[in-house]
Curated annotation (Swiss-Prot):
Primary gene name: MSP1
Protein's recorded name: Leucine-rich repeat receptor protein kinase MSP1
Entry-listed glycosylation sites: 198, 207, 220, 330, 359, 458, 472, 567, 570, 601, 687, 699, 704, 805, 821, 832
Entry EC number(s): 2.7.11.1
Assembly behavior: Interacts with TDL1A.
LRR repeats: 88-112, 113-136, 138-160, 161-184, 186-207, 232-256, 258-280, 282-304, 305-328, 330-352, 353-376, 378-400, 401-422, 423-446, 447-469, 471-493, 494-517, 519-541, 542-565, 566-589, 591-613, 614-637, 649-673, 675-697, 698-721, 722-745, 746-770, 772-794, 822-846, 848-870
Organism annotation: Oryza sativa subsp. japonica (Rice)
Length: 1294
């Protein structure tokens, strides 16, 4: 405070003659200061008035001829800091706060030896604090907040012994805090928040006995809370939040009896909250959020009689809220979200009548909302989502007249919605509960309601009248209920911005009135039963940005008026019955980033007007009947970087025109598709040569041109495509040779499929030595020469190749011992060639081999002893050679390694012919028996279900394989069959009528899942048993019988507590059904995806249990029996949770048994985006190591809470694996764990160990990944917390 003498001098100044001003140096400096002003003159008008003496200028105070105070606070001068300030040697007070000064502070400030008050806050000052500033020994207040000052705080600050206020927050000052600060015994306020100070707080700070306010928040400080804190008995406020302090809260904290504000949140503090904290009678605000506190909340908290605000969120308490909290009569805010709380909400909280905010979200609270809460009439916000609360939503909630936001989502509330006559209510969320009944017509008595979230419930009825009075409603989400009727047109009269009605039973036509809305930006009506055409009036909704009407029954053409939706960025009409041509008007929607019209019946050409979509980065027109050529303008939208509003990052750069009837050549303008990453043109009638211009698309990661009519060379360009991982050119008419330098052209190729062409020449030796290649298929060509398994330089080499098929060519020569370099091979198929010589003993070294076919060659000699001992080998064929052993069945004879075995070299052709006749006769008998058995079983099944079904999806005319033989390349394989003896218990015999009744004619009400191979319905069988019925997609035998038989073979053989058991099946006509045990708690994905704005977050013990259990299930598939099973689609949505949250691996719709019964090659994508291992590209090969990668992604989901792909992971390339690597590379490992996951020190160590295993599982190179047995072993060690180095070894224990 300025002394009285100072104001006396101000009074006397008026008696000084004006003529004396001219003699003052300060006056001259004032004119210099004025002349430097270029901005803000309007705020300083009298400075430029010649009649006004300088000492009367605004903000200027003089004593005699001397300027003693300059206060230009908030005057927008926006200029470099004035250098002339140092000339005002009599200056006592200087306030330039909020003036917009920039640049560094001048050393001349040290000349102001009389300065007592300095405020330069809210400017744009840079550089260090001048050393000369520490010479201002009269200084009492130094305020430098909100600048960009840098450097360190000098120990010279100890010279400012009169300092009472030091505020340097919101800068970039770094380094450690100088202990010399502790000598400033007059200091009352110390504010250093939001800098980058590091190290610990010096113990000397305990000498600041006058300190009232201390704020060191948002720095990088470490260590424990400094021991001298208990000496600061005058302290009123203490904020140490957002640092890295460790240890416990000292019990001596209770000695700070004057403390009114204590903020220690967002640190690494551990242990219990001390009982002594209850001694702080004056405390009004207590923040302990985002630490690692454990144990119980102390009962002594009731002693905080002045407390108004308590935040203990994001901790690891394992206790109930103490009932003593009911004694906090002044409490207005209780925030304890994600704090590890359990038990019931204490009814005593109803005594805290002043409570306005209660946030207990994401805990494990149970029971109903206490009746006593009805008296909390001051409530404004009530958040309890993500618990296990049950009962009805109480009707007395209408007493909360001041309530603005109520969030009850992700609980187990049941019954109807309550009456809500709350005039101030803005937001009501009760999603993901068990609410039933219809939406009451009085819902809009809350006439201020802006947001209503009721998705994922069991609501029924219609909404014909429900929302008519909601005149302020901007967001309505009814996703996944059982609401039926038509979409009402009155919704257009509401101020809705977002309308989400997907996954209900809405039927009828789209209302023409809906498109009259002036506000709707997002509409999603997917997965309903909406019929009829898309109305012409759709074009009236010109502000619309996202429109999703996929998977309905819409028919007719796409209307021309869609072109009036000029703001549209995302349009999905996928999976309807739309016909006609793609309208030219659609291309007036020039903001489109994603356009998906796939799986319709569209015809005609792809219009050249597509060039208007310059922001397009995802175009999906697959599975239609489009014809004509690919327009030269197709690439215009792919010339630019990805649009920021693109919905799915994994779809960026996707150009998919597959499975149409396109003809002609790929246009040379394809070179302009610079941003295309995935190019799918398979399944068309394209011809000509592969354009050399493809070699200019350096961002390509995969190309699929299979099943077309291309001719000419397979690789017409010579420059490298360094990003390309998948190249699939099978089933064309390509000729010529494979370039000798293919390894340089495709340096990172992982999947290369050149099968079923007319290629000639040799197989380049360098191709097999590519460091990235793991799938190579050159079968059914005219290749010749030797297959070189050694590298050109002759050096020893460990290949990463997993799959090699060179069958049905003209290869000759022998197999040499260098094949031992290919230890990762799981499939080796060289049948139907002209190989000669003996089998190399190195074949026994291929320990990963599970499929071996060397049949129909000219090989001779003995079988290497170790062949039959390869653990995973489930199929081997040596027939058609001069070798006794034809298949693995011959291993049972046990004589192939004996010293007195047959002399295979001397085997006469006569014996070979005789043996062939014998085998053919035996095979003929077996085939007859199998055919008769199949006929018998089919007739028996058909009799049990005479009813015919309509196929789930219409068969499309494509160039895909139409039979098993065609898919397998007419290889000799065992027939697909169902071995009913493999099932442990008798299967349920379910009739078609049972299924129709249980699913109400396949009503969408019963849908609980929809995968690539089938839709899953929740149903109750006649005897009352709840089951899940999977209706397999498929309109022909390859897509129906094959998946059905594979599923039966797979699940029937598998019995494990962590796998979903198959209960029965049903066959009728083209329809195939599987009946599974119903899993009460849904999928892991459902529990992980949503948190503060969605579903409940699982605690770490639950996540670790789920991780270990699902690993055991997958390990059993890989190693539990022969033949081994590959899942092919391992993901969080395929891990189901029973009533005890025990995990069960589900959905073997993509499973393949690697045996003679089935191929392991597929032309479809195996897996789901985000889970597919990098070696797949557009994979046609599945391996156990691919499953391991996918499971590693699931582990990362459990650790981080993030989805496998999305906007959040943009730093890592749009996927979770990349983001985790990006975070770890920057030393941010502790920041990648799920922020909604409270952890103790033990849990943190467990999480770090699981992260290490997950990183091994998601290694780019398959051979670096562990087996699932090793994963189980590592997780078991982690679960038991055997401390010390983590050593993962193979264990047979699952």
């Amino acid at each position: 405070m300025v002394s009285n003498s100072f104001w006396l001098f101000i009074l006397l100044v008026s008696f000084i003659p004006i003529s004396a001003w001219a003699e003052s140096r300060d006056i001259s400096t004032l004119f210099t200061l004025r002349d430097s002003i270029t901005e803000g003159k309007g705020f300083l008008r009298n400075w430029f008035d010649s009649e006004t003496p300088p000492c009367s200028w605004s903000g200027i105070t003089c004593i005699g001829h001397n300027v003693v105070a300059i206060d230009l606070s908030s005057v927008p001068l926006y200029a470099p800091f004035p250098l002339c300030i140092g000339a005002f040697q009599s200056l006592v007070r200087l306030n330039f706060s909020g003036c917009g000064f920039s640049g560094e502070l001048p050393e001349a400030l040290g000349n102001l030896q009389n300065l007592q008050y300095l405020d330069l806050s809210n400017n744009e000052l840079t550089g260090p604090i001048p050393i000369s500033l520490y010479n201002l020994k009269m200084l009492k207040e130094m305020v430098l907040d909100y600048n960009s000052l840098s450097g360190q705080l000098s120990p010279a600050i100890a010279q400012l012994q009169h300092l009472t206020k030091l505020s340097i927050s919101m800068n970039s000052i770094s380094g450690s805090l100088p202990p010399d600060l502790g000598s400033l015994k007059n200091l009352e306020l110390l504010d250093i928040k939001m800098n980058t100070f590091n190290g610990s707080i010096p113990a000397t700070f305990g000498n600041l006995s006058c300190l009232l306010h201390f704020d060191a928040s948002q720095n990088n400080l470490t260590g424990s809370i400094f021991p001298g804190i208990t000496s600061l008995t005058n302290l009123l406020t203490l904020d140490l939040s957002s640092n890295s302090f460790e240890g416990t809260i000292p019990r001596e904290i209770g000695q700070l009896e004057n403390l009114e504000l204590l903020i220690l949140g967002k640190n690494d503090l551990t242990g219990r909250i001390p009982q002594e904290i209850g001694s702080l009678k004056q405390l009004k605000l207590l923040h302990l959020e985002e630490c690692q506190f454990t144990g119980k909340i102390p009962w002594s908290i009731s002693g905080l009689s002045s407390l108004t605000e308590l935040d203990i969120s994001d901790n690891n308490f394992d206790a109930e809220l103490p009932s003593s909290m009911g004694e906090l009569g002044n409490l207005t805010q209780l925030i304890a979200k994600n704090a590890g709380l359990s038990g019931n909400m204490p009814k005593e909280l109803g005594n805290c009548k002043k409570l306005t905010v209660i946030n207990l979200s994401f805990n494990a609270l149970i029971g109903p909302i206490p009746e006593e809460f009805a008296d909390l009439e001051a409530i404004v916000s009530f958040f309890v989502e993500g618990n296990k609360l049950s009962g009805r939503v109480p009707d007395w909630i209408q007493k909360w007249k001041n309530a603005r936001s109520i969030r009850l989502g992700q609980n187990k509330f049941s019954g109807p919605l309550p009456v809500l006559p709350l005039q101030h209510l803005l937001s009501f969320a009760a999603e993901s509960n068990l609410l039933s009944g219809s939406i009451p017509s009085h819902i809009c008595q809350a006439n201020s309601l802006h947001s209503l979230l009721l998705h994922h419930n069991n609501l029924t009825g219609t909404i014909d009248e429900a929302f008519k009075g909601c005149t302020n409603l901007t967001e309505l989400n009814l996703l996944d209920n059982h609401i039926h009727g038509e979409v009402p047109g009155y919704l257009a009269e509401l101020p809705l911005v977002t309308l989400e009605l997907s996954q209900n039973k809405f039927a009828g036509m789209l209302p023409a009135e809906l498109w009259e809305s002036k506000t709707l930006l997002e509409i999603s009506l997917s997965n309903n039963e909406i019929t009829g055409p898309i109305p012409e009036s759709i074009g009236k909704l010109s502000v619309l940005q996202r429109l999703h009407i996929d998977n309905n029954l819409l028919e007719g053409p796409i209307p021309q008026s869609v072109g009036d939706l000029r703001n549209l960025t995302n349009l999905s009409l996928r999976g309807n019955r739309l016909s006609g041509i793609i309208p030219l008007a659609l291309f007036n929607c020039r903001k489109l980033a994603t356009l998906d019209l796939s799986y319709n019946n569209l015809t005609g050409n792809i219009p050249s007007a597509i060039s208007h979509l310059t922001l397009l980065d995802s175009l999906i027109l697959s599975s239609n009947q489009l014809s004509g050529s690919i327009p030269a303008e197709i690439c215009v939208g792919f010339e630019n970087e990805a649009h920021p509003d693109s919905e799915f990052l994994q779809h960026h750069g996707l150009l998919d025109l597959s499975y149409n009837q396109l003809t002609g050549q790929i246009p040379t303008s394809i070179k302009n598709c610079a941003m295309v990453m995935v190019l799918n043109l398979q399944g068309n009638l394209l011809n000509g040569t592969i354009p050399v211009e493809l070699g200019e698309l350096t961002n390509l990661t995969s190309i699929n041109l299979s099943f077309n009519e291309f001719v000419g060379p397979m690789l017409p360009w010579s420059g490298p495509l360094v990003q390309l991982q998948g190249l699939i050119l099978s089933n064309n008419h390509l000729d010529g040779s494979i370039p000798a330098k293919i390894g340089q052209i495709l340096p990172k190729i992982a999947v290369l499929d050149l099968s079923s062409n007319a290629l000639t020449g040799t197989l380049p030796q360098s191709l097999l030595c590519n460091n990235y290649l793991n799938h190579l298929d050159v079968s059914n060509n005219h290749l010749s020469g030797h297959i070189q398994f050694s590298c050109p330089d002759g050096k020893e080499y460990s290949s990463t190749l997993l799959f090699f098929n060179s069958s049905s060519n003209h290869f000759s020569g022998s197999l040499d011992e260098s094949i031992s370099n290919f230890t990762q091979l799981s499939t080796l198929d060289i049948h139907n060639n002209s190989l000669t010589g003996r089998l190399p003993s190195a074949l026994s070294d291929l320990s990963s081999l599970n499929y071996l076919d060397l049949s129909s060659n000219n090989l001779y000699g003995a079988i290497p002893c170790g062949i039959c001992n390869i653990f995973g080998l489930s199929f081997a064929n040596f027939s058609g050679n001069y070798i006794d052993m034809y298949s693995l069945a011959d291993c049972a004879a046990g004589g192939i390694c004996s010293t007195n075995g047959t002399d295979h070299k001397a085997l006469h052709p006569y014996h070979r012919v005789r043996r062939a006749i014998t085998i053919c006769a035996f095979t003929f008998v077996i085939i007859i028996v199998l055919v008769l058995l199949a006929v018998y079983l089919r007739r028996k099944l058909v009799r049990s279900r005479p009813l015919a079904f309509e196929s789930a999806s219409k068969a499309k005319a494509t160039v895909e394989p139409t039979s098993t033989d065609e898919l397998l390349g007419k290889k000799s394989r065992e027939p697909l069959s169902i071995n009913l003896a493999t099932f442990e218990h008798a299967l349920l015999r379910v009739t078609a009528d049972d299924i129709l009744k249980a699913t109400e004619n396949f009503s969408k009400v019963h849908i609980i899942g929809d995968g690539g191979f089938g839709t899953v319905y929740k149903a109750a069988l006649p005897e009352g048993r709840r089951v899940a019925i999977k209706r397999l997609h498929g309109g022909h035998q390859f897509q129906g019988d094959r998946e059905f038989l594979a599923e039966m073979e797979t699940i029937g053989k598998v019995k494990h507590p962590n796998l979903v058991p198959l209960l029965g099946y049903c066959v009728c006509g083209d329809e195939r059904f599987l009946i599974y045990e119903y899993m009460e708690n849904g999928s892991l994905e459902m529990w992980l995806r949503n948190r503060a704005d969605a579903l409940e977050a699982l605690g770490w013990p639950d996540r670790l249990k789920i991780c270990l259990g699902s690993a055991r299930g997958l390990a059993f598939l890989h190693h539990g029996f022969v033949p081994h099973i590959i899942h092919r689609d391992m993901k969080s949505s395929n891990i189901l949770l029973d009533e005890n949250f025990e995990p069960r691996v589900s959905d073997f719709g993509l499973a393949r048994i690697i045996s003679a019964c089935e191929t392991h090659v597929s032309t479809d994508i195996a897996g789901t985006f985000g889970y597919i291992p990098p070696e797949y590209g557009l994979t046609m090969k599945s391996t156990t190591k691919g499953d391991v990668y996918s499971f590693g992604v699931v582990m990362l989901e459990l650790l981080t809470g993030r989805p496998p792909t999305g906007q959040e992971e943009v730093q890592g390339g749009g996927n979770l694996v990349g983001w985790v690597r990006w975070m770890i590379a920057r030393g941010k490992q502790n920041e990648l764990f799920d922020p909604c996951l409270p952890v103790s020190s033990v849990w943190r160590e467990q999480m770090a160990r699981v992260l290490a295993i997950a990183r091994d599982c998601t290694a780019d190179e398959p051979f670096k990944r562990p087996t699932m047995l090793e994963v189980v072993k590592g997780l078991k060690m982690t679960h038991g917390m055997e401390c010390g180095p983590l050593v993962v070894t193979v264990s047979r224990d699952m």
